[in-house]
From Swiss-Prot:
Protein name as it appears in the record: Exosome complex component Rrp42
Compartmental location: Cytoplasm
One biological process term in Gene Ontology: rRNA catabolic process
HAMAP family: Exosome_Rrp42
Record-linked Pfam families: RNase_PH, RNase_PH_C
Domain of life, per lineage: Archaea
């Protein structure tokens, strides 16, 4: 990811990573299907309607939820609205700059949003205040504090965590506050191709030398909710099948460990 702006690895370092991978291990000692350590702190931003801090290895992000009443979209008058935004703070990585979102921020926003939306994580019909006139709009903002690889999965985990503890401020509209109606837990698993091997949760160095990236978002019922291919590279049909199998296994493990 962001190869054009990342620090260029020396050929010696690249060869070391590839040689180590041939032995079945990664340079940090992980197995191909092993995530880095995950830390989740819920309600990290007290004034938000929902929030979470997530550290995935040295990649750190904060997701915040703000819920306000507003008009529904004309084509979905009986549904609430979700809008997702990812901001790459300049402090997170040398090439990140202030200003309009770049291609990476846009891609991460879309992949996170698609996984949540297509999984039907939130029950949109339960966010209606007055059909056709007023609904709850869920603003999901994710700030990247430190980038060391695999933004998509870090942002997805933070987004899901923040939404799961979000409170709808219905008292502002004369009702009673209630928990955001969450139906399931979508988890994205991002994999890259190192040589001929698929590895999940790529570090920054693995991202820089990969031969393609693929993200698969699944839910606890075993359904695939979203897929995204990134970076330059080719995935065979067998690669895609392996990626799906790995995403189902790893996604299940993450849900069981962090989202009971």
């Amino acid at each position: 990811m962001v190869k054009e702006s990342a620090e260029i690895l020396s050929e010696i370092r690249k060869n070391y990573i590839l040689t180590t991978m041939k032995g079945g291990k990664r340079i940090d000692g992980r197995l191909p299907d092993e995530f880095r350590e995950i830390t989740i702190i819920e309600n990290y931003v007290p004034r938000a309607n929902g929030s979470a801090y997530v550290a995935l290895g040295k990649t750190r992000v904060v997701a915040g939820v703000k819920i306000e009443a507003g008009e529904p979209f004309p084509d979905t008058p009986d549904q609430g609205v979700l809008t997702t935004n990812v901001e790459l703070l300049p402090i997170a990585f040398p090439s990140f700059e202030a200003g309009p979102p770049n291609d990476l921020a846009i891609e991460v926003s879309r992949v996170v949003d698609r996984g949540i939306r297509e999984s039907k994580m939130i029950s949109p019909d339960k966010l209606v205040i007055e059909q056709g006139k007023k609904v709850w709009i869920v603003f999901l903002d994710i700030n990247v504090l430190d980038y060391d690889g695999n933004l998509i999965d870090a942002c997805t985990i933070a987004a899901v965590s923040a939404l799961r503890n979000a409170i709808v401020p219905a008292s502002r509209e004369g009702g009673e506050d209630f928990k955001l109606p969450v139906v399931n837990t979508p988890i994205s698993v991002t994999m890259v191709k190192i040589g001929d091997t698929l590895v999940c949760d790529p570090s920054l160095e693995e991202d820089q030398i990969c031969g393609g990236r693929i993200t698969v978002t699944t839910t606890e019922d075993g359904h695939i909710r979203a897929m995204q291919k990134g970076e330059i590279g080719v995935f065979t049909l067998d690669d895609v099948k392996k990626a799906i199998k790995m995403s189902l296994k790893v996604g299940k493990n993450i849900r069981e460990k962090y989202f009971r």
